[in-house]
Amino acid sequence: MPDTAPTAARARLADARLYLCTDARRSQGDLPEFLDAVLAGGVDIVQLRDKGMEAAEELEHLAVFADACARHGKLLAVNDRADVAHAARADVLHLGQGDLPVPAARAILGDDVLIGRSTHAESEAAAAAAQEGVDYFCTGPCWPTPTKPGRHAPGLDLVRRTAALGTDRPWFAIGGIDLGNLDEVLEAGARRVVVVRAITAAEDPGAAAAEFARRLRQAPAHG
């Protein structure tokens, strides 16, 4: 695990506002430089999400992520696989609705790794807000996104309903969020967001991350 004790990792999660999902930048060939730029810019949590990658290759790339997160004091997340999260000594495991059940993931990882859930309906958000062993959850998609082709986007109404739960558990809005619609997401009640293309495809990813971070930090603290 990048140099964070469990208590420190949970404190960082509580303070987190900007969560980035990115592939391994194989086509660009700039992964170390990209990670340094976005983490310095204000990304709090970074997740490697590169579907179809074999575990051995994923671990190789995660070593680069872990090094960058350790240097910048940020959280490293692994998508879907508890075994890979354990081997990579990640701070965070993120689980979708169809992935390994949380108790099974906890049996593999123990209590030291943070676990997040994806939610796509108010009932799922309410369950994640209350479920033992869950540390945070994501709610959306706010808008249709090519990252999840064919998935219905419940929209900002789900963000409003999630905000109305009044949970103290950290939660992030996700799905098609960019700098052009961020204010709508904030007005709906979110105070944390997951971003993909608005940073990964930006001309200057570090500057894009910094602008997201600035606007999120300036938003009122409720939500």
From Swiss-Prot:
Mg(2+) binds at residues 80, 99. One of its GO terms (biological process) is thiamine diphosphate biosynthetic process. Belongs to the thiamine-phosphate synthase family. It catalyses: 2-[(2R,5Z)-2-carboxy-4-methylthiazol-5(2H)-ylidene]ethyl phosphate + 4-amino-2-methyl-5-(diphosphooxymethyl)pyrimidine + 2 H(+) = thiamine phosphate + CO2 + diphosphate; 2-(2-carboxy-4-methylthiazol-5-yl)ethyl phosphate + 4-amino-2-methyl-5-(diphosphooxymethyl)pyrimidine + 2 H(+) = thiamine phosphate + CO2 + diphosphate; 4-methyl-5-(2-phosphooxyethyl)-thiazole + 4-amino-2-methyl-5-(diphosphooxymethyl)pyrimidine + H(+) = thiamine phosphate + diphosphate. 2-[(2R,5Z)-2-carboxy-4-methylthiazol-5(2H)-ylidene]ethyl phosphate binds at residues 145-147, 176. 4-amino-2-methyl-5-(diphosphooxymethyl)pyrimidine binds at residues 47-51, 79, 118, 148. Its cofactor is Mg(2+). HAMAP family: TMP_synthase. Keywords: Magnesium, Metal-binding, Thiamine biosynthesis, Transferase. Pfam families: TMP-TENI (PF02581). Pathway: Cofactor biosynthesis; thiamine diphosphate biosynthesis; thiamine phosphate from 4-amino-2-methyl-5-diphosphomethylpyrimidine and 4-methyl-5-(2-phosphoethyl)-thiazole: step 1/1. GO terms for cellular component: cytoplasm. Its EC number is 2.5.1.3. CDD domains: TMP_TenI. One of its GO terms (molecular function) is magnesium ion binding. The lineage of its organism: Bacteria, Bacillati, Actinomycetota, Actinomycetes, Kitasatosporales. Condenses 4-methyl-5-(beta-hydroxyethyl)thiazole monophosphate (THZ-P) and 2-methyl-4-amino-5-hydroxymethyl pyrimidine pyrophosphate (HMP-PP) to form thiamine monophosphate (TMP). This is Thiamine-phosphate synthase. Binds 1 Mg(2+) ion per subunit.
